[in-house]
A protein has these predicted regions:
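Conserved N-terminal subdomain of the carbohydrate kinase-like
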Residues: 2-13, 25, 29-117
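Short pre-catalytic strand/loop immediately N-terminal to key active-site residues, enriched for Gly-Thr
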Residues: 14-20, 214-228
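Phosphate-handling active-site elements
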Residues: 35-40, 214-215, 241-255
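Charged C-terminal helix
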Residues: 8, 59, 249-289
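Short beta-strands and strand-loop turn motifs
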Residues: 78-82, 108-116, 142-151, 179-180, ...
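Conserved phosphate/ATP/ADP-binding segment of small-molecule kinases
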Residues: 124-214
Length: 289
């Protein structure tokens, strides 16, 4: 019997397009597919990029983003969604208005601000709109260290400072804050921070805060430059797990396992920061069966 569309888990990505395929909606849709979720997209901007960096950003009109979201929501339905690159305050407001229109609850906000090569993907004046318009609608927000600093207004050099930032960000509305540790090197005791590359085997700690408890998800840092799209992929995996009905903490752990596998088996493509391997997690699961 043909499976009805209403029974298929569906996830929407609202983000920019990456011509190199390693990040943005391309990474999100690959991740959804690998986790058996039907993927849909609303494009907010076209980026001209490859593994060497971003050479052009062309934001779409806010109305174009809103109409894409409305087309998906009014017909296909959305079990969970994630936002990525939103570029400016006008697009953020348009996206937030559509989320409110459909009263979607499983919302993952990846506050994309800076590309791997340092290019700006969110205008400075848009950070306030992100805090005020989008975070109150988020179930989960997934900043890296620099993004957490921008959202919280706090410098983050120690684990205690990361915890304080998580508290401040959660007060803006999201149910759970996940501050990713990929930009930091510290031990679980809250040591100092180094922004340099590190050898494999050094711990990387993602901090999860639900308003009552802090959870530290510890993994091994992988020594590779091929990490393009890690943030997009992590948040997409989290949204996919939520679309399938996973509880929040379970969804975070699924996303953590997915991105760990993707980084460990990352792809040596291009001449710069290559992409992660979106099929690595599925292949590992197949081996276990």
């Amino acid at each position: 019997m043909k499976e009805g569309l209403s029974r298929i888990p569906k996830a929407l990505t609202i983000a920019g397009s990456d011509s190199g395929g390693g990040a943005g909606i391309q990474a999100d849709l690959k991740t959804f597919q690998e986790l058996d979720v039907y993927g849909m997209s609303a494009i907010t901007a076209i980026t001209v990029q490859n593994t060497l960096g971003v050479s052009g950003v062309y934001p779409l009109p806010p109305a174009a983003a809103a109409e894409q979201i409305r087309a998906v929501g009014s017909d296909l339905g959305v079990d969970a969604l994630k936002t990525g690159m939103l570029f400016d305050a006008e697009i953020i407001r348009a996206v937030a208005a559509e989320i409110r229109r459909f009263r979607w609850k499983r919302v993952v906000v990846d506050p994309v601000m800076i590309a791997k090569g340092g290019e700006t993907l969110l205008q400075q004046e848009a950070v306030a709109a992100l805090r005020e318009e989008l975070l109150p609608l988020a179930q989960v927000v997934t900043p890296n260290i620099p993004e957490a600093e921008a959202l919280s207004g706090l410098p983050i050099r120690t684990m205690q400072e990361r915890r304080e930032a998580a508290k401040r960000i959660r007060a803006m509305g999201p149910e759970i804050v996940v501050i990713k540790g990929g930009h930091d090197e510290r031990d679980a005791e809250g040591g100092g921070t180094s922004r340099s590359s590190s050898p494999s085997g050094v711990e990387v700690v993602d901090l999860v805060y639900d308003g009552s408890h802090f959870t530290e998800l510890v993994g091994l840092r992988v020594h590779t430059v091929h990490t393009h799209g890690t943030g997009c992929t992590f948040s997409a995996a989290l949204a996919a797990a939520l679309a399938k009905g996973a509880a929040l903490q379970e969804a975070v752990r699924t996303a953590r396992a997915f991105i760990q596998a993707a980084i460990e088996d990352s792809l040596e493509l291009g001449h710069g920061h290559g992409p992660t391997n979106h099929w690595a997690y599925r292949r590992r699961q197949e081996v276990l069966l």
